[in-house]
């Protein structure tokens, strides 16, 4: 159980739930530009496993790194932090 605590976790917003047991999560990150030293907001998308098809578009969710589940899926849904309004 302690090993699971070392896995990466990310918080993001669900942007797609059209696939069966899969959601697409947009994660926002602040990155410093290497030349201009300006903080730039960067968004990247992850495919995550949603076993019960609980998450809907607009929900804020926490995902955790896991073993490869398919070609693109390397994350799984841990919890739904906030439902979409």
UniProtKB/Swiss-Prot annotation:
A GO cellular component annotation here is: cytosolic small ribosomal subunit
Q: What is annotated about its quaternary structure and interactions?
A: Part of the 30S ribosomal subunit.
Offer one example of a GO biological process linked to this entry. translation
Task: Please verify whether the record's keywords include RNA-binding.
Answer: yes
Q: NCBIfam families recorded for this chain? A: PRK05610.1, uS17_bact
| Name under which the protein is recorded | Small ribosomal subunit protein uS17
SUPFAM superfamilies listed in its UniProt record: Nucleic acid-binding proteins (SSF50249)
What Pfam families does its record include? Ribosomal_S17
> What does the protein in this record do?
One of the primary rRNA binding proteins, it binds specifically to the 5'-end of 16S ribosomal RNA.
Q: Which domain of life is it from?
A: Bacteria
